[in-house]
Amino acid sequence: MQYLTQEQAIKLDEELMGKYKYSLVQLMEIAGLAVAQVVTKEYPIEKGNKRVLILCGPGNNGGDGLVCGRYLSLFGYEVTVFYPKQSKNEHLQLLIKQLEIQDIPVVTELSSFEYDAIVDAVFGFSFKGPVRGIFKDIFSHINSLKVPIISVDIPSGWDVEQGYLQDGIQRCDVLISLSAPKLGVKNFKGIHYLGGRFIPLELKDKLHLILPYKENELIVKIN
């Protein structure tokens, strides 16, 4: 399995949206659906995992979380989106409106963390530490819980190339790497999936990426 540096991950996204004409909207939709599929696979409703908290950051990773929340609601989960630092980006605001129209709570404060699973969609591969402000307090509280955590692309607060940092998410049970895994999760010991199947075959071959999907799979376990 090949692991991407931060620079490689950024250039990959640029090429997807440049030469291959993907929009950010498309990438978020495909990524968010993949995350939702991982949640249903690892924490199915029939095993008592109905209440899911989606913790969203202000950037694109948070957008993936918003999309994930919409799909999980369609799949029958009781979803709450915790979005303490909302972006004014037009597309992200549209994603919020979609949730609100479908009566999916989007909140900026939480009085309880009593959920069956938490989706960590705060910081992605563009993050450069350290963790500051409200998210430092949120991560500290989440790290004290025993609720399963599913991280999107990389556990929030980790260095994209060096891995775990003290003020980030300390315990990630399930990780879904988008496009290709990042260098900072090379030694990740939890359940690891690959998702976000939007890399054209030509680009895959050019970058020598190993993407072990079979036929019509949108997610695949890689450990």
Curated annotation (Swiss-Prot):
Its EC number is 5.1.99.6. Its cofactor is K(+). K(+) binds at residues 61, 120, 156. Residues 9-211 form the YjeF N-terminal domain. Keywords: Isomerase, Metal-binding, NAD, NADP, Nucleotide-binding, Potassium. This is NAD(P)H-hydrate epimerase. It catalyses: (6R)-NADHX = (6S)-NADHX; (6R)-NADPHX = (6S)-NADPHX. GO terms for molecular function: metal ion binding; NAD(P)HX epimerase activity; nucleotide binding. Disulfide bonds: none annotated. It comes from Entamoeba histolytica (strain ATCC 30459 / HM-1:IMSS / ABRM). The keyword Cytoplasm does not apply. Belongs to the NnrE/AIBP family. SUPFAM superfamilies: YjeF N-terminal domain-like. InterPro entries: YjeF_N_dom, YjeF_N_dom_sf, YJEFN_prot_NAXE-like. Catalyzes the epimerization of the S- and R-forms of NAD(P)HX, a damaged form of NAD(P)H that is a result of enzymatic or heat-dependent hydration. This is a prerequisite for the S-specific NAD(P)H-hydrate dehydratase to allow the repair of both epimers of NAD(P)HX. GO terms for cellular component: mitochondrion. (6S)-NADPHX binds at residues 60-64, 124-130, 153. Binds 1 potassium ion per subunit. It is an enzyme of class 5 (isomerase).
